A protein has these predicted regions:
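Conserved AdoMet
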Residues: 29-87
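Conserved beta-strand signature within the Rossmann-like core of class I S-adenosyl-L-methionine
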Residues: 228-234
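Conserved SAM-binding loop of SAM-dependent methyltransferases across substrates and taxa
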Residues: 113-129
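S-adenosyl-L-methionine
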Residues: 139-174, 181
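Helix-to-beta-strand junctions that scaffold the AdoMet/dcAdoMet cofactor pocket
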Residues: 129, 224-226
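Conserved class I S-adenosyl-L-methionine
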Residues: 100-112
Length: 452
């Protein structure tokens, strides 16, 4: 282990604690999942994660790819230490005064691949019901597609996926009530999982990350409302990217540090936040701290023209789409694609489209082929899809895998037309049943590629 890194770790968590951590870096990485509370499935074997009601530690890593309910969004594979950030968010959410007459507005700034986004979404729905909007942003174009897919699998219609630099959010002056910034870092917490993270570590890289993190927070800061809450997190250990950056935010941007008084097994309390370190917890490395904004800011910057939503080529939104959902939705048509957002969030989503590059919002409903709507795979996964909207057909494990592999399946006893394929009661997606065979509507981009 790099001697300079040893010094950084000892500075951050103390010499004795660092010795425990060093001995753990050679041990195998743990495996954990977080269940989707809005997609009920049979109990999974595992040990509870103490700070996450829906978290489970697994004794060994199964083939998640060959588990159909993984593709149904029944759970998300997430490191247990990462779930602690969701725990801090929940504690803050439960203590906050919810706004009246509008949804609570939350931003997950550096959201890919979506673990923390889906954790936040579950907490928001539990505490706020339908009265929230969660913007999940990822600036890297190569990663935003994975984020959008994972959000679709989770199935919550109150999540908006965007792809913008943090600077773009400055125009949304005071819009967000809460921001999670899980900022890019030197990755010291991933040393056990990623040998490249060890090889790439250097003091220069730490300094580079520290400066970049400050720039990211300073850029997004105007979009946080006065008295709004920032959760700052990294997957690294050193003080420069963690406690010292938190103090910099407080001193330079105008914020008060919130207490780090949670007492969870194995979690180390640092000067301003929490550090989760292998050897003390089963998961990987994670840091987080929270602050409340005390500085005032400007409101929305006006004067920008709305981004074009594209032509609908003379198509019209079909009648009767409300019957697909168990919530009132507002439908939109771009080209031949129909999308829907919850009616009470429509004004927020329209406004966000004026300032940001919105990748997805609400739920993709389907594609028009003439006057026929071909249902979208994302609608099958939505937690607000009405149970009676399409005929449902339950399949066994092997047939579910064949469907997810995009092999041809036949369900001659099911009604002809569009049918919702389910496994263990959870929708996997649509087929068009022709009687002797089915045309699969499962996206090529999500198909299982390994042998089944």
């Amino acid at each position: 282990m790099n001697d300079k890194f040893r010094k950084y770790l000892e500075e951050a968590i103390g010499t004795d604690n660092a010795l425990v951590a060093f001995s753990a870096f050679d041990s195998p990485a743990s495996v954990s999942v977080r269940l989707n509370p809005f997609k009920k499935s049979d109990p999974m074997p595992g040990r509870p994660v103490s700070w996450c009601r829906y978290g489970l530690m697994l004794d060994q890593r199964p083939s998640f790819t060959l588990d159909p309910i993984f593709h149904a969004g029944a759970y998300y594979v997430q490191d247990s230490s990462s779930m602690f950030v969701g725990y801090v968010f929940r504690k803050l959410l439960e203590d906050c005064r919810l706004p009246q007459g509008r949804p609570l507005r939350v931003l997950d700034l550096c959201a890919a691949p979506g673990g923390k986004t889906t954790d936040l979404a579950a907490s928001l729905r539990t505490v706020c019901g339908d009265d929230f909007i969660l913007v999940a942003n990822e600036v890297m174009k190569a990663r935003v597609g994975v984020l959008a897919d994972n959000v679709a699998l989770w199935g919550d219609p109150n999540v908006v996926v965007t792809s913008d630099d943090p600077r773009a959010f400055a125009s949304l002056g005071g819009y967000f009530d809460m921001i999670l910034a899980d900022v890019p870092c030197s990755g010291e917490g991933m040393f056990r999982k990623d040998e490249q993270a060890q090889l790439q570590w250097s003091e220069d890289n730490v300094a580079l990350c520290e400066a970049r993190q400050r720039r990211i927070i300073a850029d997004v800061w105007p979009s946080l409302a006065e008295n709004g809450v920032l959760i700052y997190s990294t997957c690294t250990f050193n003080r420069y990217e963690n406690d010292l950056n938190v103090r910099w935010i407080s001193d330079n941007l105008g914020a008060e540090l919130l207490p780090n008084d949670a007492d969870e097994p194995g979690v180390i309390r640092t000067e301003y936040g929490y550090s989760l370190v292998p050897g003390f917890v089963e998961g990987e490395g994670q840091y987080c701290a929270s602050l409340r904004k005390t500085s005032s800011g400007d409101g929305l910057v006006s004067g920008r023209s709305p981004k074009s939503t594209g032509s609908s080529k003379g198509n019209q939104i079909p009648d009767g789409l409300d019957a697909y959902f168990c919530r009132k939705m507002k439908f939109a048509l771009k080209g031949d694609t129909v999308t829907a957002v919850p009616e009470e969030l429509a004004a927020d989503v329209d406004m966000l489209r004026q300032y940001l590059h919105v990748i997805s919002a609400g739920c993709a409903v389907g594609t028009l082929k003439g006057k026929i709507l071909v249902p979208d795979a994302d609608m099958a996964l939505s937690i607000i899809l009405d149970d009676s909207s399409f005929p449902r057909y339950e399949v066994d494990h092997q047939t579910a895998l064949k469907y997810l592999h995009r092999d041809t399946i036949a369900i001659p006893e099911a009604p002809k037309g569009y049918v919702l394929i389910c496994h263990m009661g959870l929708p996997l997606g649509f087929v068009k049943n022709l009687g002797n065979r089915c045309n699969s509507l499962h996206p090529q981009s999500r198909r299982i590629r390994m042998n089944i």
